Amino acid sequence: MKMKAYAKINIALDAIGKREDNYHLLRMIMQTVDLYDVIDIEKSNDSNISISCNKHYVPTDERNLGYKAAVLFRDEFNIKNGVKISIKKNIPVAAGMAGGSTNAAAVLVIMNKLFNVNASLEVLKEIGLKIGADVPYCIEGGTALCEGIGEIITPLKPFENKILVVLKPNFGVSTKEVYTNLDINKIRKHVNIEGLIQAMENDDLDYVSKNMKNVLENVTLKKHTILKNIKEDMRKSGALGAMMSGSGPTVFAFFDDMLTAQRAFEFLKGKYKYSDVYITRTINSNNL
């Protein structure tokens, strides 16, 4: 049984506090984009969970979030069968685009159908939260306000069909390290989430592009100054606005039209030769 597992971007990411367990309390606007991995799962004749992937650098053991999802799902519903999981990876790894989380989400959704468990989305999201804070959102997808550590999800009016260019530099970033180095007291300006939500409801891409904000840029851009150059190059190439997604290092930019986006794509691909560059669009969860 196959399923597309879509990437996400953060149109806004704000940190407003910390829990006792040191997890940051966040307010984020998340958005699904049309860049996806393909997850294919079949039952096996034994009790083993095996993973194969087309990219050699993706772990295929218990470090893989898809593997963790399969283990938790089996435990939760007392399933004895093993599964063979195949991952066709297109989403860049350690990129701030929820590549691992969206794979875990797809594994839970597929296994729910494959074994006729018929668990509700809410139950799947509860299992997903044990794997990672982005997994519940990845199960739901679309345009959403995510609060808490990311698990409190409020669907928003779809902000679909917006053109963007995405650039993932040829290095990864540790999400844990970024959050460890984030000092909430040094955040001088918090994100105007409500203003952004209003603009998105009005389909005002220009306002969204110029006012989107990610407080994690304070940490990641300090360590990787090339990201500032990438953002600047995107703007000079005609972007309405550019920002880092999640903990980085991926940077994305919205464009008014496909021709300008195409030119920016070609320029960025030429300048940042060892980076992954994509043209994609925002999509609604109903497209999943």
UniProtKB/Swiss-Prot annotation:
Q: Which EC numbers does the record give?
A: 2.7.1.148
User: Where is the catalytic site?
Assistant: 8, 134
> Which BP terms from GO are recorded?
isopentenyl diphosphate biosynthetic process, methylerythritol 4-phosphate pathway; terpenoid biosynthetic process
Instruction: Identify the residues that bind ATP.
Output: 92-102
Q: Which chemical reaction does it catalyze?
A: 4-CDP-2-C-methyl-D-erythritol + ATP = 4-CDP-2-C-methyl-D-erythritol 2-phosphate + ADP + H(+)
Q: What is the similarity comment for this entry?
A: Belongs to the GHMP kinase family. IspE subfamily.
Any idea which GO molecular function terms this record carries? 4-(cytidine 5'-diphospho)-2-C-methyl-D-erythritol kinase activity; ATP binding
Q: Tell me which HAMAP family the record gives.
A: IspE
For this protein, the record's InterPro entries field holds: GHMP_kinase_C_dom, GHMP_kinase_C_sf, GHMP_kinase_N_dom, IspE, Ribosomal_Su5_D2-typ_SF, Ribsml_uS5_D2-typ_fold_subgr
Task: Give TM regions.
Answer: none
Pathway(s) of this molecule: Isoprenoid biosynthesis; isopentenyl diphosphate biosynthesis via DXP pathway; isopentenyl diphosphate from 1-deoxy-D-xylulose 5-phosphate: step 3/6
Q: What is this protein called?
A: 4-diphosphocytidyl-2-C-methyl-D-erythritol kinase
* Organism this protein belongs to: Clostridium perfringens (strain SM101 / Type A)
Q: What does this protein do?
A: Catalyzes the phosphorylation of the position 2 hydroxy group of 4-diphosphocytidyl-2C-methyl-D-erythritol.
The gene name on file is ispE
Keywords in UniProt for this one? ATP-binding, Isoprene biosynthesis, Kinase, Nucleotide-binding, Transferase
